[in-house]
């Protein structure tokens, strides 16, 4: 058999087993663990290439071939970092392996035929679409911004630029929930809405779940008291929905211990389990040590930099309807911004104690920067703390798997949607993001929704080829008309059973959430650590299993000015 050099092979078909890639301008390196191809039988599209009639393309009928094949892609997933062809059929992932013509090629697991489209994955990294579970639906323009960053699922609450929405992620009551479910039809994004959980009697909460809310949000601005927490979790247990909480910063209704006691060991998603986002001051971060708590943090403090503290005070005053002329409001804001706990947040992410990353969109967080901030945090921790125990010196595969799980599979598991989204696995919806390695984590090349291209970098539409400037993100056919049906609207099981889609005449597919109430921290993939936490109420020092968590703020970050003109 003829041979070519490893470099030449990578230039033609992309890297293979043992090759390494640098992720953008970070200090993170991945190494291909396995290549599913058969060497010498690779498929590639183009003039003089393999995927031609009677060669790499078979004569098989539509039902026996893929709708789309992404060829020779590097897949970065919580389950592995591999090279493979990805086959899509009916909007779902139908295969990860070797594509081609099974009539003449060996080891083919996915047939290419006359009904098959090809997306070139050579030299590209492919990931699952991101899942952002901390959305304040303040304006619809957030959705396009998030999509262009690689996020394909948004979960949260709100009704627009009302003060309640600006501060809390709640869509309160059946009328607002139905209105937002109807509005969701217009967007190329999977959407799910959280109702208001701050009620001490069950009926107002049950009404919201039956109306279609996929969960309930407890927020201190509505009063996260032990009574409201207990009632909310009781309703959630009965109706199989998730509860998210932003706890009591001022410790008015109780301290952290009282809130944890109100949980009664029941599953809960704790928002802002972090350094400055809100919740019991100063020790909400200690909740990461609880076996029933599924913790997330938001991107305004990700990662800790020399500018983090300075920008937070003004952001906080605006988001929570505070008045800088009122001393008590200023004191409230200042109590939430703590250098020590922000630094600890970096390390808790790195050891897998904080399980998820999210945005807190327009409510201190930036909706288009969840993925970017995740990888900036991973880079900062690599530089400051070295390789993780599971990584050899030559790659950061385990760290990369840990961090990608924070914005893909773990939030999907937490909110009961991992049976359809959150990872690249056979049978799941084909919400897929393609990246050039030099732009990984910051600027995707193409975003697919249920196998249809919904957004991409695209040049001048009047040019003779697709690449002339200005090249920028543009909506593609999957974002228009019937193409919007490639996105889903998530609802509760009770609303699904009642026929909420037909009742509201929704056009997008309606999918029920499920299997959340049994979850434990151990179910958070690569992010299940439950260290014994201590937070000093005077100095704000944070310890995990007795170790003081300290790190310096970053002065320079990757994925930053190098990639943006403005």
Swiss-Prot record:
Gene3D superfamilies: Metal-dependent hydrolases, Urease, subunit C, domain 1
Annotated Ni(2+) 2 binding sites: 217, 246, 272
Binding site for Ni(2+) 1: 134, 136, 217, 360
Catalytic residues as annotated in Swiss-Prot or TrEMBL: 320
Record carries keyword Cytoplasm: yes
Entry annotated with the keyword Cytoplasm: yes
Entry PTM: Carboxylation allows a single lysine to coordinate two nickel ions.
GO molecular function annotation: nickel cation binding; urease activity
GO BP term, example: urea catabolic process
InterPro entries per UniProt: Amidohydro-rel, Metal-dep_hydrolase_composite, Metal_Hydrolase, Urease_alpha_N_dom, Urease_alpha_subunit, Urease_AS, Urease_asu, Urease_asu_c
Protein name per the record: Urease subunit alpha
Organism expressing this protein natively: Janthinobacterium sp. (strain Marseille) (Minibacterium massiliensis)
């Amino acid at each position: 058999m003829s041979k070519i050099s490893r470099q030449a092979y990578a230039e033609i078909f992309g890297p293979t087993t043992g090759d390494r890639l640098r992720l953008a301008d970070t200090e993170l390196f991945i190494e291909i663990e396995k290549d599913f191809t058969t060497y010498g039988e690779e498929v590639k599209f183009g003039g003089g290439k393999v995927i031609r009639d009677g060669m790499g393309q078979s004569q098989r009928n539509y039902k026996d071939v893929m709708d789309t094949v992404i060829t020779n892609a590097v897949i970065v997933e919580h389950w592995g970092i591999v090279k493979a062809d990805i086959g899509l059929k009916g909007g779902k992932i139908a295969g990860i392996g070797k594509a081609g013509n099974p009539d003449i090629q060996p080891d083919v697991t996915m047939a290419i035929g006359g009904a098959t489209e090809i997306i070139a994955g050579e030299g590209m990294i492919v990931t699952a679409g991101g899942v952002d579970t901390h959305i304040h639906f303040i304006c619809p323009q957030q959705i396009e911004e998030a999509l262009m960053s690689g996020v394909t699922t948004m979960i949260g609450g709100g009704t627009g630029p009302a003060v309640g929405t600006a501060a809390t992620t709640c869509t309160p009551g059946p009328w607002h929930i139905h209105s937002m479910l109807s509005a969701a039809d217009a967007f190329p994004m999977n959407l799910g809405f959280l109702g208001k959980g701050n009620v001490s009697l069950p009926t107002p909460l049950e009404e919201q779940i039956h109306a279609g809310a996929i969960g309930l949000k407890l927020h201190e601005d509505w009063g996260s008291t032990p009574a409201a927490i207990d009632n909310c979790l009781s309703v959630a247990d009965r109706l199989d929905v998730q509860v998210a909480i932003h706890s009591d910063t001022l410790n008015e209704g109780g301290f952290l211990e009282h809130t944890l006691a109100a949980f009664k060991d029941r599953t809960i998603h704790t928002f802002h389990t972090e350094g400055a986002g809100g919740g019991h001051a100063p020790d909400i971060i200690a909740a990461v040590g609880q076996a029933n708590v599924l913790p997330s943090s938001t991107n305004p403090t990700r990662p800790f930099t020399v500018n983090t503290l300075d920008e937070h005070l003004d952001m906080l005053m605006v988001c929570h309807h505070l008045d800088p002329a009122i001393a008590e409001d200023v004191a409230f804001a200042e109590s939430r911004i703590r250098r020590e706990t922000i630094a600890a947040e970096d390390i808790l992410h790195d050891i897998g104690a904080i399980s998820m990353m999210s945005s807190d969109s327009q409510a201190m967080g930036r909706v288009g920067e969840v993925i970017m901030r995740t990888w900036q945090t991973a880079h900062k921790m690599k530089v400051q703390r070295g390789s993780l125990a599971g990584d050899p010196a030559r790659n950061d595969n385990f760290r990369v798997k840990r961090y990608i799980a924070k914005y893909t599979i773990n939030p999907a598991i937490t909110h009961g949607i991992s049976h359809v989204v959150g990872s690249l696995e056979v049978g799941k919806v084909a919400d897929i993001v393609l990246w050039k390695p030099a732009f990984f984590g910051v600027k995707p090349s193409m975003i697919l929704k249920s196998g249809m291209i919904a957004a991409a970098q695209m040049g001048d539409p009047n040019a003779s080829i697709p690449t002339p400037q200005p090249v920028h993100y543009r909506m593609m056919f999957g974002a228009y008309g019937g193409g919007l049906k490639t996105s889903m609207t998530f609802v509760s099981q009770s609303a699904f059973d009642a026929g909420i889609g037909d009742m509201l005449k929704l056009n997008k597919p309606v999918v029920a959430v499920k299997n959340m109430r049994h979850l434990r921290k151990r179910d958070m993939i690569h992010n299940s650590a439950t260290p014994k936490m201590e937070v000093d109420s005077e100095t704000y020092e944070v310890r995990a299993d007795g170790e003081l968590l300290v790190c310096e703020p970053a002065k320079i970050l990757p994925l930053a000015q190098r990639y943006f003109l403005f």
